[in-house]
Design a protein with these regions (language model features):
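Catalytic cores of nucleotide-sugar-dependent glycosyltransferases that transfer UDP/GDP/TDP-activated
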Residues: 1-485
């Protein structure tokens, strides 16, 4: 670490990663993790004790994608860059297919670091693929290694087995055996594991043989509270809104209204990737089996970004097809909206505020939820929530008091919770106010970044190489790579 502060390298390999206008929901790999690493990078780069933050991801020169993903280096902010390294060719591929190409990514990253002549103080891997990459680089350069799992293989395997999926099918489709093996290795060598919740430490990492070896630090992510401001700000006569915000709101209302016979009803809102674990079908079933709920409120499901369902990946295609079939089964025409796309930068904050202004509710019925960032976003705008009782939402509801936890497999419980909030002015007002106030108290990126910087400085002060010449790789492979590259 120089006198100017920390140089932090983060790694997040899968999905579509760029600094602005994130394509969240475009596919199963471009979700909350992508948003997390971008927001974290921005927040860390603003810290006084941080000199530079680089986020490493894959270089993608694919005609099906924006040219943004083919920029070798993208400057997001003065002290924050996205660095794209080519591995496994130039085409986009889902994360399960990346494993054979990770060593290529490591080798090319070593070359990049040596060409830059600037050794990182910290390497931080997000998800097991990037965790493996960061672990190898930590060994090579003798620097501390931080890991954030975002989701874990053993927990996923347990859920898939419960759903009836055969183990050999899991291995073929998800490379689950390789993922768990790498996760066990990461737990042996990580200097620090950053998690979002205490439940993650206790229940998810507790499933691993090496789960007690690392140091853990619970650092919940934050949200941009200026972007997700309360819904009533727009109702005030002195409110000054940008043309971009006004356009986003008008476009969303126009899109929603074309689906609804009675558009002025309260709005039940769901926003997620088209993934089976998100349990969209469970929410539609809860709504479809409750005629009184249909009379009270409309349902809008924003399930990622889609064009032609038949051309999508199998998991996404199955989820969206099931969604359409459920809509038809329960005859929800005129009551349910299923828009094909939405803009996360401008439209999503407006979407929460539209639902809040209609005194609606946001629902996250996921079967498994490592954290639940959308719950924070909704709560911050004053939109009450109904959330799965699995994982991160437990901490969020405990800290914020902005809604009700439910068993995501119980459609009756989901319907009851929605009904309780929408039908009671007292409940709605209580949950709305709690969310607005408590998100701002407990969940900001500034708090996260300050605590992160303190942990990073502690790790660095414990001893590391300070320049390229002083590097002492942790193993023979590292010594060879430093010499050859």
């Amino acid at each position: 670490m120089t006198e100017n502060g920390l140089y932090i390298q983060m790694f997040s390999l899968h999905g579509l990663v760029r600094g602005n206008n994130l394509e969240l929901g475009r596919d199963a790999d471009t979700g909350g993790q992508v948003k997390y690493v971008i927001e974290l990078g921005k927040a860390l780069a603003e810290q006084d004790g941080v000199r530079q933050v680089d986020l490493f991801t894959r270089f993608l020169a694919d005609n099906a994608l924006s040219e943004d993903y083919a920029q070798r280096v993208e400057r997001v902010a003065e002290s924050f860059r996205i660095v794209r390294i080519q591995c496994g060719g130039r085409k986009y591929m889902r994360k399960e297919l990346l494993w054979p190409h990770l060593d290529e990514f490591v080798d090319k990253t070593v070359k990049f670091i040596k060409n830059e002549k600037s050794l990182p103080d910290i390497v931080h891997g997000h998800y097991p693929d990037a965790g493996y990459t960061a672990m190898q680089l930590a060994r090579i350069f003798g620097v501390p290694f931080i890991f954030t799992g975002h989701s874990l293989g053993r927990a996923k395997k347990q859920k898939l087995l419960a759903e009836g999926l055969k183990e050999d099918e899991m291995v073929r489709k998800y490379r689950i055996d390789q993922r768990i093996r790498i996760e066990e290795e990461i737990l042996k060598y990580a200097d620090l594991i950053v998690t979002s919740t205490h439940q993650e430490v206790r229940e998810q990492y507790g499933m691993y043989h090496n789960g007690r070896l690392p140091d853990f630090r619970v650092l919940p992510p934050g949200i941009d509270i200026e972007k997700f401001y309360p819904y009533y700000h727009d109702l005030l006569p002195e409110s000054e809104r940008s043309e971009t915000a006004l356009y986003a709101q008008a476009k969303l209302l126009q899109e929603l209204n074309r689906f609804f016979l009675h558009p002025n009803k309260p709005l039940i809102l769901a926003l997620c990737r088209p993934d089976k674990r998100k349990n969209i079908h469970g929410l539609i079933r809860a709504y479809g089996e409750a005629p009184d709920l249909q009379a009270m409120a409309n349902l809008a499901v924003f399930a990622g970004i889609r064009r032609d369902i038949s051309q999508m990946e199998e998991n996404e295609r199955d989820v969206l097809t099931q969604m359409l079939l459920a809509m038809d089964k329960y005859d929800l025409y005129g009551k349910m909206a299923i828009p094909k796309r939405h803009d996360f930068e401008h439209e999503v904050p407006e979407l929460y505020r539209i639902a809040a202004a209609k005194r609606g509710v946001f629902v996250n019925p996921a079967l498994t939820e490592p954290f639940g960032l959308t719950l924070l976003e909704a709560s911050a705008t004053g939109l009450p929530v109904v959330a799965t009782n699995d994982g991160g939402p437990k901490d969020i509801i405990k800290n914020c008091g902005s809604g009700i936890l439910v068993d995501p497999t119980d459609s009756g419980a989901i319907a009851d919770a929605i009904r309780e909030i929408i039908s009671s002015n007292h409940s709605w007002d209580k949950f709305s106010k709690n969310g607005i106030m408590n998100v701002r108290q407990h969940y900001t990126w500034q708090h996260h970044a300050e605590a992160y910087r303190a942990e990073a400085e502690r790790l660095v002060s414990a001893g590391q190489a300070s320049d390229m010449a002083a590097v002492v790789p942790r193993d023979a492979i590292g010594r060879r790579l430093v010499r050859l590259n």
